[in-house]
Amino acid sequence: MNYTTQMDAAKKGIVTKEMEIVAKKENMNVKDLMELVSKGKVAIPANKNHKSLDPEGIGQGLRTKINVNLGISKDCYNIDMELEKVQKAIDMKAEAIMDLSCFGKTEEFRKRLIDMSPAIIGTVPIYDAVGFYDKELKDITSEEFLKVAEKHAENGADFLTIHVGMNRKTAATFKKNPRRMNIVSRGGSLLYAWMELNNKENPFYEGFNKLLDICEKYDVTLSLGDACRPGCIEDSTDASQIEELIALGELTKRAWERNVQVIIEGPGHMTLDEIETNMKIEKKLCHGAPFYVLGPIVTDIAPGYDHITSAIGGAIAATHGADFLCYVTPAEHLRLPNLDDMKEGIIATKIAAHAADLAKGVKGARDWDNAMAKARRDLDWERMFELSIDEEKARRYREESKAKSKDSCTMCGKMCAVRNMNRVTEGKDLNMLRDDD
């Protein structure tokens, strides 16, 4: 193999098997895709050690992809349950899964996840550091943090989320500009704490060249984390968030010089009117790199319904440039999600992604909706169920309602507009009063 990474291959004019697969999925010319990869506008996360991967592209002109978060925690240390969630995410065709495990020895779960998953796998190495070394956070050395990142890359993680932009300059900006919610990024808060406790620079920022060595070796995509993402609408688009984004733009160029693919992570909580501006700022400051957003969550008052607040924000964000949506479940801010929460979160996020693809004019996006419109016009219930984003729920609602006619539902009965327009255009009587037709 005469290339190191997908980006290196693209710059050399080499079409990889991963590019061929992605181009076919996206209904696009593989040479056009290769050009986007060479410029960093599209990333194809594909670790050389992830043998079960069914690759996907993330970025400009492609379908909006979604990510599912899962992982073991101290309060819910159940590997079998988390593996059930993995299977659920795979069955529901999530393009990516992030292992956010944050307690104990996580390698067993991570390796099993990567072995079984055709989806892109992402991890956050700093979550693993305390358990990896059985050390207090402040006692972990800079070199040890990098070794954890290398272990995750060696295991086969396709992208690593690392909050490199939380450097001393960003930290100083944060201190000068108090926030209502401080730092709500788990990884960002851990790095900030380590820096404060040790009076040192961010080990990933200081050792960025070594981090790039790791990414280049395994063809790991670097997902530059947003330590200063807003945790409430009052903190959005503030000095800390923008200062960090400027740093991420500079780091992006350094990574691309080494042929390391980059994804930029983004907010967070913000009101509807700020979303479009934030998408444009990221694309400008980070040179068109793919943008990966959590939500955005558009109001802070809906615990139990944050899959909805997130889907609203995600649809707007993806319409205006976000390429990758992290799902949010009804359990957000309340507990570790269960399987039912997962399903709700995946469905809501897939709806947001598809709605944005329609608005962006992504090739082929309208085909699904047009097929549903035809099935509805034809009153073809079976086809409607097959096309539904949640087939099980659609079937259940229909079966529970016990409509008297196969041509209608319990909402309108024989006053169904579709039924009556079909009949009248065919020259048939409406037969509104008889039950036998």
Curated annotation (Swiss-Prot):
<comment type="pathway">
    <text>Cofactor biosynthesis; thiamine diphosphate biosynthesis.</text>
</comment>
<comment type="similarity">
    <text>Belongs to the ThiC family.</text>
</comment>
<feature type="binding site">
    <location>
        <position position="333"/>
    </location>
    <ligand>
        <name>Zn(2+)</name>
    </ligand>
</feature>
<keyword id="KW-0004">4Fe-4S</keyword>
<feature type="binding site">
    <location>
        <position position="127"/>
    </location>
    <ligand>
        <name>substrate</name>
    </ligand>
</feature>
<dbReference type="GO" id="GO:0005829">
    <property type="term" value="C:cytosol"/>
</dbReference>
<keyword id="KW-0949">S-adenosyl-L-methionine</keyword>
<dbReference type="InterPro" id="IPR002817">
    <property type="entry name" value="ThiC/BzaA/B"/>
</dbReference>
<dbReference type="GO" id="GO:0016830">
    <property type="term" value="F:carbon-carbon lyase activity"/>
</dbReference>
<dbReference type="GO" id="GO:0009228">
    <property type="term" value="P:thiamine biosynthetic process"/>
</dbReference>
<feature type="binding site">
    <location>
        <position position="292"/>
    </location>
    <ligand>
        <name>substrate</name>
    </ligand>
</feature>
<feature type="binding site">
    <location>
        <position position="416"/>
    </location>
    <ligand>
        <name>[4Fe-4S] cluster</name>
    </ligand>
</feature>
<feature type="binding site">
    <location>
        <position position="269"/>
    </location>
    <ligand>
        <name>Zn(2+)</name>
    </ligand>
</feature>
<dbReference type="GO" id="GO:0008270">
    <property type="term" value="F:zinc ion binding"/>
</dbReference>
<feature type="binding site">
    <location>
        <begin position="185"/>
        <end position="187"/>
    </location>
    <ligand>
        <name>substrate</name>
    </ligand>
</feature>
<dbReference type="InterPro" id="IPR038521">
    <property type="entry name" value="ThiC/Bza_core_dom"/>
</dbReference>
<feature type="binding site">
    <location>
        <begin position="226"/>
        <end position="229"/>
    </location>
    <ligand>
        <name>substrate</name>
    </ligand>
</feature>
<keyword id="KW-0862">Zinc</keyword>
<dbReference type="GO" id="GO:0009229">
    <property type="term" value="P:thiamine diphosphate biosynthetic process"/>
</dbReference>
<keyword id="KW-0479">Metal-binding</keyword>
<protein>
    <recommendedName>
        <fullName>Phosphomethylpyrimidine synthase</fullName>
        <ecNumber>4.1.99.17</ecNumber>
    </recommendedName>
</protein>
<dbReference type="InterPro" id="IPR037509">
    <property type="entry name" value="ThiC"/>
</dbReference>
<keyword id="KW-0456">Lyase</keyword>
<comment type="function">
    <text>Catalyzes the synthesis of the hydroxymethylpyrimidine phosphate (HMP-P) moiety of thiamine from aminoimidazole ribotide (AIR) in a radical S-adenosyl-L-methionine (SAM)-dependent reaction.</text>
</comment>
<feature type="binding site">
    <location>
        <position position="412"/>
    </location>
    <ligand>
        <name>[4Fe-4S] cluster</name>
    </ligand>
</feature>
<keyword id="KW-0411">Iron-sulfur</keyword>
<dbReference type="GO" id="GO:0051539">
    <property type="term" value="F:4 iron, 4 sulfur cluster binding"/>
</dbReference>
<feature type="binding site">
    <location>
        <position position="98"/>
    </location>
    <ligand>
        <name>substrate</name>
    </ligand>
</feature>
<keyword id="KW-0784">Thiamine biosynthesis</keyword>
<feature type="binding site">
    <location>
        <position position="409"/>
    </location>
    <ligand>
        <name>[4Fe-4S] cluster</name>
    </ligand>
</feature>
<feature type="binding site">
    <location>
        <position position="69"/>
    </location>
    <ligand>
        <name>substrate</name>
    </ligand>
</feature>
<dbReference type="Pfam" id="PF01964">
    <property type="entry name" value="ThiC_Rad_SAM"/>
</dbReference>
<feature type="binding site">
    <location>
        <position position="163"/>
    </location>
    <ligand>
        <name>substrate</name>
    </ligand>
</feature>
<keyword id="KW-0408">Iron</keyword>
<feature type="binding site">
    <location>
        <position position="265"/>
    </location>
    <ligand>
        <name>substrate</name>
    </ligand>
</feature>
